[in-house]
Structures are given as structure tokens and as C-alpha cells.
Amino acid sequence: MKALLLENISGVARAVFEKAGFDVETTATALPEEKLREKIGDVSILGIRSKTHVTKTVLESAPNLLAIGAFCIGVDGVDRDACNQHGVAVFNDPHSNSRSVAEIALGEIIMLVRRVFAANSEMHGGHWNKTAAGSHEVRGLTLGIVGYGRIGSQLSDLAEAAGMRVIFSDVTDVLARGNARSYSFREVLEQADIVTLHVDGKTRNRNLFGEEEFRLMKPSSYFMNLSRGFVVDHEALARHLKEGKIVGAALDVFPDEPESSGPFSSPLQGLPNVILTPHIAGSTEEAQQNIGQFVSSRLAEYIETGNTMLSVNFPHCQLELVPGSYRLSHIHHNMPGMLLAINKVLAERSINIERQVLDTRGEIGYAIYDINRPCDEVLMRRLGDIPHTIRFRVAETPRSLQFA
């Protein structure tokens, strides 16, 4: 079996897959769709980061693909509906780089409020300008966090430790940490000295922040976005920076990001007290190693056992492997009678079901079975031919798999 790892994924992942018996190919960059279609035909596991787009067309060129690992938080570039249609499980890591993002956010808050980057630019330009004008302590300032998930809540802890008052807004009713307090979206914008966005990539957040939202912010406030590029109207932000309503900004994500190292353009370039970074908030060596270990382990476990815990598109099913039993898994459309149909095929062959679990998620149903004897070719064909079956898989030992 083959694993294809794109975008310079941590070598930790390669080691996990090689230990599991995979042939591993790696690339340092994302691949354009046509090139990816050429390479993916014999691939069982595809590893990506945020630049790769796995479309329906790509999946149609990947008959052997069993699972995709997004070695990042977001899975915006993966067509999950098409993955469901092809029986491809998708996994990501929503945790491992949260600390890295929270730390750089706090660092940028301090850099903005102290005008460090503006002073740095003057010094590199040969101008000494020792002044306290426009430079402040963060202690006592109000930080407004929009999106109080894993990253937002960790930033809340760090900011409070630095002496800041923390308020937040979230679309769900989440528990506040420390002394942080929940407010409406509008109230956060009106009260915060610094507004920072940490929202997810769902459609509801597209164009979340534009002209109207910037007008609601306090005069001489700061703005940060380390979430998704499509969340913010950068032209509107540039206008408010030039007018002095917003006195500093930090952005790590952009509406149109290059696929690899190369030219970049933004209306925010050249503006004073604006920090621009190339989508690196979560890119620390520690985070990438942890993500590499976590996602590759989830993928290897899925291939070896069929367990789908933490999949972003499949139902979450898990059965402990028991020596002496034979495991099969069945991906199907969520239709009445599927469990009965599978059990009937097994019963007709006098096969005993030792353990089973079935769950559904939207249009997808997923079942794991442990049975008392191996599947022969006739049984494999019968199970694969059950109406509404998407994919059937049987494993006689953890690393000896057959597919139908």
C-alpha cells in the first residue's frame, strides 16, 4: 500500500507509515489538480496541509484511496461530500497547533501595542526615534476574542495572565475560562481595545468582518485575524488603517494565498504598524511534529482496524481488536435495512458475529464486524454486492488487508 504526503508534512508521519508497512512518497509543496490526479491512482493514503484541494475530480482518479489526512486544523480544501460518495474517510488534528497560534497572537498583541514593528522599520531605515508616543502596556487593555474555541480560549488564558481584561463572542454557548466574560458580537467590537478573530472555516463566517464591523470598533483600536482569509474585507481594513480609526493590525491569513513560495500582493502592504505573516501562526516545529504523529496514527489505525474515531466525515465507530477474530467494515448509504442485509449474508454462510457496531452520520452509515472465520471470495463478493454499499473492506490481520 502507498501513502502520498504533500506540502512538507513532518517526517514523523513518514516514520509512522513506514512502520505500518506503507511505501511512502513525499513532496515539499502542494500539487495542482491535474498533477495530483496523475499521481493518486495507486495511493491508499493521502496526506495534505492547507494548500491542497481534493476535489470530486481528484477523487474520481483515486480508486484505491481509503483515507485522507489533513495535517492541519481546517479541512476546507477537501470535498467531504465527494469523499462520502467514494467511501474515503477524512481525518485532521484540531488540537496540536492551538498553542502555537495562541502564542503568536499574544506576541503580536504586544508588538502592535508597543509599536515594535514600526520602530524596527525606522531603525532598519537608518532613523533613530526614541519615543513613547502611541506605545502602551497591554496590562489593563480589553481583548475581544471572536471565536472562543481551542485557540481563542488558550489565548484568553495567556492574555489574562498578562493582565488584560478578556471578553469574547461565540456562536455557541461555551464556558468562559478564568475571568473572561461572554458578550454579543457587537458588544465585543464596541468595547475591545484589540479585536482578534479565531473563527472556523464554515460558510457562515465568509465576509464576517467588513466596513460595518470596522465602524463599530473603538477609535484607535487594533485588529487581528489568524483564522481564515475569506473572513475579512482587506480593502475595508486598509481604509480604516489609513484613516487612523484602526491604529494597528496583524494578519496571518489572506483571501488569495499563493500555493507555494513566490510573489504576493495585498492592499495592507506598506502600511505602518501592520504585521503580515505568510500563514505561519500554527507552523512551529513542535506543532508540526505533534500533528504528524496524531494524524498519521489515526490514519494507520483506520487502515488496520477500521476504527473511525475523530473522523470529520464518517460516523465514529470503534471496536477493540481481539485475537482470533476476523474484522470487516462496511461503508454504505444511510438506508433502512442495511444491518439486516449484512447480517443475513453472514447468517446464510453460518458465520457467527462476535462483535459489531454501527452508526450513521448524515447520508453515511458505517459498520464494523468481528466474525469467527475468514472471508472467502464468495462472501466478499456477496457483502460488496449488497444494495447501497459504497465500500466493503476486510482485514484478516491488522496489516493484511483486502478490499472490495
Walk through the language-model features, giving the residues of each.
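Short, Asp-centered acidic motifs that coordinate Mg2+ and/or phosphate
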Residues: 44-45, 67, 194, 222, ...
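An N-terminal-biased, well-structured beta-alpha scaffold segment characteristic
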Residues: 1-91, 188-190, 210-216, 349, ...
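Phosphate-binding beta-alpha-beta segment of Rossmann-like dinucleotide-binding domains, i.e.
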Residues: 86-142, 154-161, 307-311
